[in-house]
A protein has these predicted regions:
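Intrinsically disordered, charged low-complexity linkers and terminal tails
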Residues: 1-98
Length: 98
């Protein structure tokens, strides 16, 4: 894991990443940006659910031009979830599936 400077990422970068996810669809988005589906949390935006780590990693790429690997940063409560909540986004724990 590397030390990522999240201060360059704004709500606009995150919104742009969400738009990219909607435009490409999950499969192509993950293939293009190097992430996978979420396992524990969802970013909730306009009543839709998104993978927080993938969205934040892509937002970082939009903000800095630097691509992050999934292994470069944490996605949980002390990682992507915390950064997105600090930017004012809603994060929800995924519902348990049986």
């Amino acid at each position: 894991m590397i030390k990522v400077a999240w201060d360059s990422v704004t709500r606009d970068h995150v919104s742009r990443a969400i738009g990219e996810y909607d435009r490409l669809g999950p499969e192509q988005f993950f293939a293009q940006h190097g992430f996978g589906p979420t396992t524990t949390y969802d970013l909730v935006w306009n009543k839709r659910r998104y993978p927080p780590k993938a969205i934040l990693g892509t937002a970082y790429e939009f903000a800095t031009g630097k691509r992050l690997d999934s292994a470069d940063f944490e996605g949980g409560k002390s990682g992507a979830v915390k950064v997105l909540e600090n930017l004012g986004f809603t994060i929800r724990k995924k519902a348990a599936t049986s």
